[in-house]
Amino acid sequence: MFKVLKQEGRARRGTFTCAHGVVQTPVFMNVGTQGAIKGAVSAHDLKEIGCQVELSNTYHLHLRPGDGVVRQMGGLHKFMGWDGPMLTDSGGFQVFSLSGLRKITEEGVTFASHIDGRRIFMGPEESMRIQSNLGSDIAMAFDECVENPSPYEYVKASCERTARWLERCVAEHDKLNGLSDTVNPQQQLFGINQGGTYADLRVWHMEEIAKVNCDGYAIGGLAVGEPTQVMYDIIDAVEPHMPREKPRYLMGVGTPSNIIEGVARGIDFFDCVMPARNARHGKLYTWQGTINIKNEKYKLDERPIDPTCSCPACRSFSRAYLRHLLTAGEMLAMRLAVLHNLHFYNELMARIRESLDSGTFSDFRAQYSGLLDRPCQED
């Protein structure tokens, strides 16, 4: 269940209720692709850094250890020791990124495993069964994520097929939730809007899938190489056609500024591997902009990454020490850097929510959109 508590322009402050708790929105979901955040970050750590929702990947968990194994272990929450809300993606993005290894039909997709090359079939029903076995709170509908750019006629046909697939997802999902031995009988289902960068197809597809009674709706297929302004233009085109009373999820986005601009356009949920990936390469976020901790100038810097930050890294260690760990290839460096960046993203969302509560989001947007993505000028 989703409830809008307050609005400022199109930006929404709300709550989303699921089997494992109440989520305060807007929210950033921390990405644990294979049931763990890369960087030796545990479920216990996620609680400490303010994570509300954990996201895991259907494709990867289906291949290893197998969704049947996870089901026998009591579901993904119990398996990874996370008792909060969880979303699983449909596996579609990963399957369709295997462009040379897959074949698409009306029934679904046959593809070769990236692990051992064996042929695997996944369609709407299979995706729903896997996600039911995982027991997530939010399952995502199976969709085709087309490459940008792709020919108009191909994208149109893909949108039509994805709309048909959604109806099959809903039917299978309802059936699975009704089984007596299902892992999470309260699992919710989000539909996904596609259409490449063609605004008319995006609008048509959104209107079609809005006719199906999903628990929420996502905008997929963006942040895959198109210019940032094109992404914003697509959101602007689609958002007026998204149901007001349902949560909106912008998949795979993005930078801090992307998130602020997404919130301004009416988006409630975000996810991205960027904070953890950037951390592993030494790019860290602060409220004055980004820093590359590997730079020589931090060799004798006694300050924390960000003096205003309360993450485990900033509470205890200097920039000089973290730089040393990264350049020495120590595993602790990756862990501390990832914890910092994820804490920053969760703190960003908390401050966005506070600004919406106080009616000052437009001021927050003016101050931080753009700034947080640029290199820090304080040095």
Could you describe each region identified by the protein language model?
Residues 1-182, 296-299:
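Non-catalytic, usually N-terminal nucleic-acid engagement modules in DNA/RNA processing proteins
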Residues 172-182, 246, 352-364:
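Surface-exposed helix-capping loop/turn segments at secondary-structure junctions
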